[in-house]
Amino acid sequence: MDVVKKSRNVHGANDFSELIVSVRRVAKVVKGGRRFSFSVLVVIGDEKGKVGCGIGKHLEVSEAKVKAVNAAKKNMIRVHLRESRTLHHDVKAKFCASKVMLRSAKVGTGIIAGGSIRLIFEVLGVQDVVAKSIGSSNPHNVVYAVFAAFKKMLSPKQVANKRSRKIGDIIENR
């Protein structure tokens, strides 16, 4: 049972906003019958370029969510943003059968993405982006594919070093 549920919590100490991507009820079959528990997938971010995802499992949904948030805090990555509103360059990535294409966009475009990809960009702080999910639409695989794409992205400094140029030349030519 996949439920895309939006709940935005901001914690005072770290200022992370968190969104629930999916809640699943899973069953373990034992001799006496079935034992039900819950699996929760959460994405958290500071809306300034840091984002993380985590899965939590427990008998209660609230406890599973707490575990997922703690796992997401341990799994945070930094994404370099252009003008604090969009991605620096286009990127493609794949995880299992899910493929994602993430493209930077002009000012005023908004977040053109569906499902769990939109939630990730909301907590990341991106305002203008175009994203496409191809293949499997399983929320877990799509989230992991987006994170694989983020890990493939290069900062302007890395691009400048690869091209043996100055950072200013890279940023001006956009």
Curated annotation (Swiss-Prot):
Which Pfam family is one of those matched by this entry? Ribosomal_S5
InterPro entries linked: Ribosomal_Su5_D2-typ_SF, Ribosomal_uS5, Ribosomal_uS5_bac-type, Ribosomal_uS5_C, Ribosomal_uS5_N, Ribsml_uS5_D2-typ_fold_subgr
Q: Where is the S5 DRBM domain?
A: 16-79
What biological processes does GO assign it?
Answer: translation
Cross-referenced PROSITE patterns, in alphabetical order? S5_DSRBD
Keyword annotations of the record: Ribonucleoprotein, Ribosomal protein, RNA-binding, rRNA-binding
The GO molecular function terms of this record are: rRNA binding; structural constituent of ribosome
Q: Which domain of life is it from?
A: Bacteria
- Give a GO cellular-component term: small ribosomal subunit
Q: What is its biological role? A: With S4 and S12 plays an important role in translational accuracy. Located at the back of the 30S subunit body where it stabilizes the conformation of the head with respect to the body.
Self-association and partners: Part of the 30S ribosomal subunit. Contacts proteins S4 and S8.
User: What NCBIfam families does this protein's entry cite?
Assistant: rpsE_bact (TIGR01021)
Q: Which family does it belong to?
A: Belongs to the universal ribosomal protein uS5 family.
Q: Return the domain comment text from this UniProt entry.
A: The N-terminal domain interacts with the head of the 30S subunit; the C-terminal domain interacts with the body and contacts protein S4. The interaction surface between S4 and S5 is involved in control of translational fidelity.
What is this protein identified as?
Small ribosomal subunit protein uS5
State the organism named in the record: Ehrlichia canis (strain Jake)
- Which taxonomic lineage is given here? Bacteria, Pseudomonadati, Pseudomonadota, Alphaproteobacteria, Rickettsiales
Q: Which gene encodes it?
A: rpsE
